[in-house]
Amino acid sequence: MTARLALVITALFFASCTSESTPPPNGAPAPGQEVASSLSRDTAPDTTADELARLTADNAAFGWELYRELVKDRENLFFSPHSISVALAMTWAGARGNTETEMADALRFSLGQARLHPAFNALDLELASRAEAGGANPPLPFRLNVTNALFGQRDFTFLDPFLDTLAIHYGAGLRLMDFVNEAEQSRVAINSWVADQTEDRIEELIAQGIIDAATRLVLVNAIYFTASWAEPFDEANTRSDPFTLPDGTEINTPTMHGNAAMRYVDAENYEAAEVPYDGQQLAMLLIVPDEGQFAAVESALAASTLAQILDELSVHQVDLSLPKFSFRSLVPAKEPLRSLGMVDAFGGAADLSGMNGTGGLFIQDVVHQGFIAVDEKGTEAAAATAVIVGETSAPPAATLTVDRPFMFAIIDRPTGATLFIGRVVDPSN
């Protein structure tokens, strides 16, 4: 089976508190030109193992708190707390005063400015190395690409220290746009860049009307992930099986069937299994509440409970039945972030003076979009046995039939980074 695609885009829009603007000066760089810091990305950041562990723990805490805000009035959901954290960390580099404090509290940043950005750089570089760990001939080449970019008003001055921080720790350059006179053309150009980064899976991230003449900066983070399972599902075994919705309605949905060694637990009110991807570095954690327990299990999910679930898992030989699913989530993140305490950044009280030296900037909006597709396309993946190294006897058998709503997370095993979080209430939607 191939977990074909998981990709997420986060975009933030920054506006001036005044819509007044002067025409671009003679000799100003042309729209579309990239103005980069003179400094190169640091490929060997000075980060300790403890700092990296704190960062991934903080991001997980933020991710599950944001999850609780996002699932309100939703069925299926897919988003990347990592993508949102990276985009807002780049923003935080320019935040000062109470805006800086509120953002750190909402995002659960426990590292200060001097240590957070090198830690994000170290994590990004660590994730970039994952493609080297795949099998010899997977049905789908492993890809985990994280890309950052800034699009700024061509006649607006951004401070060199701000641009240096983003270049050194995030590899992000500044592409110049003319939001004042060409807002719609700028929107189309940014959407085109996003489409290029996501193999055309996300073509319309920014809707009409979001960018206007007051926009001064658009900051974008993209994550593109595609991989094969370590153990394949046989397409011939896929069949239409029943799946029970929260209201008790039973539908039939294409369901894959396979048997493989994986870490599994049958807990008090849920079952969980960690299904590894090719190379064994990343895995999808399935959390399947018992019948009637979905709300209780979901409401208890947090970084600490996720760690507890992972700690409880042990290797079993699992008969796994998993629905195929594919959906897109458009996540307006502004109000959920407000609910988490990030208030000043979105209005006149914002202090983003670290970006331009004078302030007068605020975040117009935060747009986040994710797409995931899981199916059994492709040929058989290279079998891996890393999960059973050290076992001296056959692991116990277990059966996990995912025939009811479930949550999932895609986790980088060596660092513990939670890259994606989602839930499937209706796999046919």
Where are the model-predicted features located?
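Proline-rich low-complexity regions
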Residues: 81, 108, 289-291, 323, ...
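C-terminal, non-catalytic macromolecule-binding modules
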Residues: 303-306, 337
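Short Gly/aromatic-enriched secondary-structure transition segments
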Residues: 101-107, 233-242, 295-304
